[in-house]
């Protein structure tokens, strides 16, 4: 059975692309900084897309500070979490990226601190990036106890919550 993937992980794609759109429309440009959205595939098939990227590009950015934020399943607002550990706790994500996310969440214009957590089951692409030597962390909003849309045919656009 196929899962349409509206929440896992079209919502993550929306967040990444929307961030770029917001920067452009606001006229925000950074000196000596590049912001991009990397959309990897095959996360559900063993993090293959992110893993392939890390293997292909390992060492290319060693002289450039590089941070990766993996947005995954942005549906349940009350469960928005910064994941400092991944792959059911087996992989430690970057404390630097977690600190940057904390700083952004605590900014007076945002003022919405997020809890830290461990990906309770499975993994996000941040695990592959962290294992591959990149500084990465994940942000997701999914009820860990009840997600009737998760990994099944019910993960359709009508299950998305745009406010999240």
Indicate where each model-derived feature is located.
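Acidic/histidine-rich catalytic neighborhood of metal-dependent amide-processing enzymes
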Residues: 1-93, 122-126
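Active-site-adjacent substrate-binding region
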Residues: 74-164
């Amino acid at each position: 059975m196929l899962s349409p993937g509206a929440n896992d992980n079209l919502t993550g794609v929306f967040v990444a692309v929307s961030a770029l759109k917001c920067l452009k429309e606001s006229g925000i440009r950074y000196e000596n900084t590049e912001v991009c959205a990397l959309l990897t595939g095959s996360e559900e098939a063993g993090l293959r897309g992110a893993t392939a990227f890390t293997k292909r590009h390992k060492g290319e950015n060693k002289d450039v500070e590089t941070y990766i934020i993996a947005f995954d399943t942005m549906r349940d607002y009350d469960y928005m979490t910064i994941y400092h550990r991944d792959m059911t706790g087996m992989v430690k994500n970057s404390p630097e990226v977690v600190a940057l996310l904390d700083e952004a969440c605590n900014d007076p214009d945002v003022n919405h601190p997020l809890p830290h957590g461990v990906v309770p089951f499975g993994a996000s692409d941040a695990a592959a990036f962290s294992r591959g030597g990149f500084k990465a962390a994940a942000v997701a909003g999914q009820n860990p106890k009840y997600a009737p849309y998760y990994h099944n045919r019910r993960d359709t656009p009508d299950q998305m919550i745009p406010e999240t």
